[in-house]
Amino acid sequence: MEKVIRLIVLTLFLVLADAITAPAQTKAGKYAVRLTVTEKGTHEPVVMATCSLDPLGAVTVTDADGKASVGNVPAGVYRLKVSYVGYEEYVSNVKVGSDLALAVQLTPTSLALQEVVVTARQNASGTSTSSKIGRQAIDHLQAASLADIMQLIPGQVIQNTDLTAQQNLQLRSLTNNVTSAFGSSIVVDGVPMSNNGVLSAGQFSPTAFTGTDLRQIGADDIDNVEVVRGIPSAEYGDLTSGLVVVHSKAGVTPWQVKGKINPELQNYSLGKGFRLPRAGVFNFNFDYAKAWGDPRQKTRSYGRYNMSLGRGYAFTRHWHAETKLRMLYARDWSGNDPDAVDDGSYWKNKNLSFSLTHNGRVSVGKPLMRTLSYTLGLTLSQADSHNSSYVSVSSGLLPIITALKTGYYSVNWATQSYLATGITESRPGHFFAKATDAFFLKAGNTRQQFKVGMDYQYTWNSGRGFYNADDTRPYRANNNGRPRAFSDVPGIHQFAAYAEDNFTWHLNEVNVLRSQLGMRFTTLQPFGDLATYALSPRLNLSFAVTKWLDLRGGIGLNSKTPGLDYLYPDKKYDDRVAANYMPQDNPAGRLLVYHTQVYEVEKSKDLRNATTTKVELGIDVKLPGNRRLSILAYRDRTPNGFGADTEYFTYRSNVYTTASGLIATPGGATVIDYDNPARSDLVFMTTGKIGNTNTTVNRGVEFDFDLGEIRPLRTSVYFSGAYSETKTWNTLYKSKSVPSAYLPADYSANNVTPFKLVYNNYDYDKYRRFVNTLRLVTNIPSLRMVASFTGQVIWQDYRFNYIANVSPVGFIDTNLNYKSITDNMLNGYLDLNGNYYAQKPTGIHCIPVKELAIKTSDAVPERQKPTWNLSGRLTKELGKVGGLSLYVNNMLFYEPYLRANNNTTTLTQRNTGNFSYGVELYFNL
């Protein structure tokens, strides 16, 4: 730990030393840039507009008169950017050689403009591989949540809006991978949406597929989104895979009423941004959505209420802040159709969440502290889940086991099915604080923008946890799960520090070197027995070889800390029959006794952060006519993802019969002599340990081709796609019990094994996909209308669940000792005590070793035939009053009958569920 801290301090010292020792600028060599920002046409001042000078990273905000200034700017040429919600971003090159006073006019966003952007735009070379999606693209897409916006990213498959199913972020991954979903980061207005406080209990696995639900974020309150697929800035952490940065609306906007309707969804919103003298700018948004899985049956539904209230204001001339309060209420439900008989079975989940975010920016103007930014965030959630279903009795009687401690228990039983309800009450909370110091330097032809900062997070869960509505009728009877109090689990602290240098070097007028070099240090529960530490160096590079060709690449490390569920797994329960005496002529003497074994799963002291190494290499080509081509190859490897760890312990479980142990009295109760069992079984049981046992490798090639505009048709053409491969496997050995066919009858009858066989694990799952997307966007400014047609082809959809043919390499005996099985032992025999014999002995039950091999014959890759989808969208502005949008997905209703895959001749209907249509109408008041 001390070495790690020393390394971090040294890194920060070197960054600061680099800044201090850089050639000093004289006061005369630094200038002020003063801005006056107004609306084009009305010349009204634009308040709280964000102004930045790149690549120096100097950022400021306009005041009540629309004025802003940036001081101490070294001489040189910079790119000035001015942005505000509802306006086109202003971008211009500014040559600074003296004090400047600039007048900037912002143009309101409108379809009457010559250029309309309704697609995702690639980020500049030399920074993280990412796509930016603006408000116009979100409106044209008619997105209902953040999940819908993701389909604009290269390689993503076009799908219908479906709010009835949980939507998680899976970038560059072709399967619902646990670590990928858990390691995706969603940052809203500077505060990450943490899922570290999620806990499980009952029948749920602590390694279940988890991730932030994208349905929670309504699309109508979003101003813009940045989706980072590559190596992120060192400013962002606690992630392994993708990063999505969401900026909500902030600024003066008219009253806007929106409504979107399709057969499965109704979504309405109301929003307004207004300014109060001396109080700042206020923003209000309310969103309601209701969705059904199938409107004909309505067996699944989802309802969402989102409300936000924000304020932007200035404490002083140099201190600007934004505060936003959000409320979310969401309800998932599935059950019987309203027209069907209501048998009482259903599932519902309610989520009520309040979040408060506060972002501030102080223009300090010092050499080593140009701008000080800070973020504070607090989220309190209440998630209640109710599961109600019938528990069936299939074997005459069903034991009702509720024991929470190890021992022998006389249990009641049910003889007929009953309706049971299981309830989970979760109360996760998350606090976040962050501070960043930004400053810049210029020396000759080089410019450097530095970021140095730290953040802190605290996550907890104070919920009641899982419990049964009626303990005499448990939801999962005779099951491993038992009630669990989430409030018993302690919270977790996380600290991080980071430093980053964005470097630009103009070697000449053509050749430019850009780099983003950063280091991030993350620690969880520092100095405690659960402490984890991780260093995450990150580098993005680009070099302009010619005016039309850029080479770029990068390598970086991401790190995800384990959440509460991984650090504090639930107890393990195992229940075995100890006595089952059911005399027909003596009801009073009937007795059912179970032995319950409880294993107190230790907290995960050996668990490490899941880390992903990202490597990228690509080219950016600028072609005549504003055409552009980007090609990127990537490889993301996570060698230590979270998963179950195979670890055993053994225990004794006694069985009592009338021959030994049970004392039956005619007409009276039956009692047990626990010291006189008829049989004592030695049972293997897993401990429930969590480890870094999963490895995932994602690799592929992405491309994005802007083919420019066909001017006579006013149509822009965009062609993108990706070839992706995901391979995932378990790094642990495989283990299993001895097959019952090679054991005496009493072993299989009593469900025990003499030892556990161990095999090398060569199994893996591999997925491949090759997808192309062609978009035609036609803009007609005179009609205030834009139309787009999107065609997508999935050329390859490949899946291979490989199971290797392997022989045992060892076994774990009843003393939990591992004993090897070498190659020259495969033709021998093992007795029930694990003793090896080269020749089969007489009079001893033995197991032929070669028969214990795992042999498979059906591990064949599955390949599906290509399918395609064609969708159309139209957006029309109705002057300044409002607008109308229409869309049709799978507009040719292409649902062919094709072979399911290459391994079968059965025809199945493909591309089903993709046909949809809808309309959106909005009014500006």
Model-derived segments and their meaning:
Residues 30, 36-42, 47-54, 83-85, ...:
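Short, acidic, small-residue-rich periplasmic hinge/interaction motif at the N-terminus
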Residues 50-54, 58-67, 115-144, 165-170, ...:
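N-terminal periplasmic "start-of-domain" segments of outer-membrane beta-barrel proteins
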Residues 71, 191-228:
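Short acidic/polar hinge/loop motifs at secondary-structure boundaries
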Residues 104, 211-256:
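A beta-strand signature from Gram-negative outer-membrane beta-barrel systems
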Residues 147, 151-195:
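Extracytoplasmic beta-strand/coil segments of soluble accessory domains associated
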Residues 314-330, 347-528, 700-702, 718:
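Face-selective signature of the C-terminal outer-membrane beta-barrel domain
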Residues 637, 654-808:
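Gram-negative outer-membrane beta-barrel transporters
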Residues 792-853, 864-866, 874-925:
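C-terminal beta-signal and adjacent terminal beta-strands/loops
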